[in-house]
Regions:
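Pro/Thr/Ser/Gly-rich low-complexity, intrinsically disordered linker/stalk tracts
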Residues: 1-25, 53, 66-72
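Generic structural microfeature
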Residues: 12, 26, 43-46, 56
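Alpha-helical interaction segments
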Residues: 19, 46-48
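Short beta-strand elements bearing conserved aromatic residues within extracellular beta-rich modules
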Residues: 27-31
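Predominantly extracellular/luminal cell-surface or secreted proteins
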Residues: 32-34, 62
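Short beta-strand segments within Ig-like beta-sandwich modules, predominantly Fibronectin type-III
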Residues: 36-43
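Beta-strand-rich modules
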Residues: 48-68
């Protein structure tokens, strides 16, 4: 699977989770920010809101089995 940064603002990011699905991903993924799960998603494009400006974040993606699929 590939993870791409689609858009970044001071308080949000939009990600593309490319696992071969068109609108929906082929499975559900967990989105982690600095190691903490913040949401689950089954859509190819997903967004995270409420981020703080001038702050570094590690955004990771895991499948339902907890296998790390990538990070930004």
């Amino acid at each position: 699977m590939e993870i791409r940064l689609v858009m970044k603002t001071a308080r949000s990011v939009s990600l593309e989770l490319d696992d071969g699905g068109i609108y929906k991903t082929k499975e559900v993924y967990r989105i982690l920010v600095n190691g903490d799960e913040v949401k689950t998603t089954d859509t190819v494009i997903t967004s995270l809101y409420g981020l703080k400006p001038d702050t570094d974040y590690e955004i990771g993606v895991e499948d339902a089995r907890g296998t790390r699929q990538g990070e930004i």
